[in-house]
Amino acid sequence: MPQQTAVVVLAAGAGTRMRSKTPKVLHSLAGRSMLAHALHAANEIDPTHLITVVGHDREQVGAAVAAVAGELGREIVPALQEQQLGTGHAVQCALRALPADFAGDLLVTSADVPLLDGHTLGALLDEHRSYQERSAVTVLTFVPDDPNGYGRIVRDADGQVVEIVEHADATPEQAAITEVNSGVYAFDATVLRAMIGRLSTANAQHELYLTDVLRLAREAGHPVHGARLLDAAKVTGVNDRVQLSIATRTMNRYILERHMRAGVTIIDPASTWVDAGVRIGRDAVLRPGVQLLGSTVIGEDAEIGPDSTLTDVRVGDGAKVVRTHGEGATIGPNASVGPFAYLRPGTILGEAGKLGAFVETKNADIGAHSKVPHLTYVGDATIGEHSNIGASSVFVNYDGVKKHHTVVGSHVRTGSDTMFVAPVTVGDGAYTAAGTVLRRNVPPGALAVSGGPQKNIENWVQRHRPGTAAATAAAQALAADEKSSQATEQKDGEQ
């Protein structure tokens, strides 16, 4: 029977240094809250039990835990820490949420360490289980640029971990140690249960330190171990907005490197941002200034950018998207979008379709090979295949109270400046003349022309706008025309 594993994510702290109405662990980077990153990482090692300790802002944090549980399709048990009496007390609360007979390994991590990934947790668990057949306690350690504030890892002459001394309790000699505690641990659950009840608040913080379990286990003759992590960034905590900004940039670097190693070309990583939940196909190209956010999916051989932001957008294989802002849209294979297009939620562009310069769409289903080349708004509409919408056309979908739908068939050609006053239907193969205002349905194959013959009211400007620059220009032009006409008549008379 496989050995059981539990993961405890500590998320009960107040996080006052963030100076925010939002709980610290719910601040986001790369499209997920710090808490969500921690839970996703824990889930990657497929634990038997996943527990989150909540305290401050328990309603908000608890709701976030439930949301992540839904995303992952698994149970995440919240454990309430009524009073924040230290990390040892938090784990005591978590143990109550575990089955009484659980005797596997228990990992402890924190929700404010968002860069810690499942691979690192898995490696820690493997080392914990292999050290002297099975360690009682394994602590993940690292060497930061500035160890101030971290608990120091005290080792003996043989390099074995003796204890962890919190910064506030460290002697000058101990404070000089550069190897520190990451706050990430692996425990033998049976040993942990035996030792955690012996914790004391006799320290500078008057709290129950989880770190003391390591010392107590060693004194009881159990093997303890320190596993050093070379990439310190992965276990760097986030306590304020400056650290959040640093962590955000570091996580983006990790994400971009992962995609590049998987076959994605990223021209300028310094100007490219990709959320953790984004998927990108092989041989796709991201040009400078690209942001891929939310659950965006980019197909193989697609080209995105420059200067494009896509949120929850699906882009098909081979599509090209240039200087575009898109939200909740679907772009078909080999389609072309941009520059300066705005795709709003509900937009579907079919295979090899085109949305060109200064086109805005919303709740629009545009068929394969159809084109909306430029300067057009398409809202609440269905357009068939192989149709072309002329420049400066508007789908007039709102009557001031509710919105209405327009249907344009396949192989339709509309002239520039066509107004589709919904609800209206244009049949397959129909045409519209430039400047047409469609208020009635157009039969298949018909040419729609609206308005009467053009009427010119001569000298209107001079009569109604006398003294203006327009009136002066008109008078001069008319005089020049009259002079030219007289000269022509004189020349004809001489002949």
Curated annotation (Swiss-Prot):
Database matches in NCBIfam families: glmU, PRK14352.1
Full protein name: Bifunctional protein GlmU
Pfam family, one: NTP_transferase
Pathway(s) where this gene product acts: Nucleotide-sugar biosynthesis; UDP-N-acetyl-alpha-D-glucosamine biosynthesis; N-acetyl-alpha-D-glucosamine 1-phosphate from alpha-D-glucosamine 6-phosphate (route II): step 2/2; Nucleotide-sugar biosynthesis; UDP-N-acetyl-alpha-D-glucosamine biosynthesis; UDP-N-acetyl-alpha-D-glucosamine from N-acetyl-alpha-D-glucosamine 1-phosphate: step 1/1; Bacterial outer membrane biogenesis; LPS lipid A biosynthesis
Lineage of source species: Bacteria, Bacillati, Actinomycetota, Actinomycetes, Mycobacteriales
Family as reported in the entry's similarity comment: In the N-terminal section; belongs to the N-acetylglucosamine-1-phosphate uridyltransferase family.
GO cellular component: cytoplasm; membrane
Annotated active site: H374
Compartments where found: Cytoplasm
Quaternary context: Homotrimer.
Binding, Mg(2+): D112, N239
Gene name per UniProt: glmU
Region (Disordered): 467-495
